[in-house]
UniProtKB/Swiss-Prot annotation:
MuO-conotoxins are gating-modifier toxins that inhibit sodium current by trapping the domain II voltage sensor in the closed position to prevent opening of the sodium channel. This toxin has a preference for Nav1.4/SCN4A over Nav1.2/SCN2A sodium channels. It blocks Nav channels by interacting mainly with the C-terminal part of the pore loop of domain-3. It also blocks fast-inactivating calcium current. Blocks Nav1.8/SCN10A sodium channels and has potent and long-lasting local anesthetic effects. Belongs to the conotoxin O1 superfamily. The presence of a 'disulfide through disulfide knot' structurally defines this protein as a knottin. The cysteine framework is VI/VII (C-C-CC-C-C). It is found in: Secreted. One of its GO terms (cellular component) is extracellular region. Keywords: Cleavage on pair of basic residues, Disulfide bond, Ion channel impairing toxin, Knottin, Neurotoxin, Secreted, Signal, Toxin, Voltage-gated sodium channel impairing toxin. Expressed by the venom duct. Pfam families: Conotoxin (PF02950). Its main location: secreted. It comes from Conus marmoreus. One of its GO terms (molecular function) is sodium channel regulator activity. The lineage of its organism: Eukaryota, Metazoa, Spiralia, Lophotrochozoa, Mollusca. This is Mu-conotoxin MrVIB.
Length: 82
């Protein structure tokens, strides 16, 4: 019984994964995502996407662990932007 339930869940998961990852011949999904992002009307929402960045030799946290990122063109070395 448990094996049957696991098989059903696995088949449903793989079916959903296949449908989500399927390539749309006319890029229908890609166009919807780009359109909704480009036509965003709320200016406050765009402010939320901007993050403060750390300049060279300033303290940073690895992006996976924290919220302080290095400015464009720099990478977070061992706890400082280089």
């Amino acid at each position: 019984m448990k094996l049957t339930c696991m098989m059903i869940v696995a088949v449903l998961f793989l079916t959903a994964w296949t449908l989500v990852m399927a390539d749309d011949s006319n890029n229908g999904l890609a166009n919807h995502f780009l359109k909704s992002r480009d036509e965003m009307e709320d200016p406050e929402a765009s402010k939320l996407e901007k993050r403060a960045c750390s300049k060279k030799w300033e303290y940073c946290i690895v992006p996976i662990l924290g919220f302080v990122y290095c400015c464009p063109g720099l990478i977070c070395g061992p706890f400082v932007c280089v």
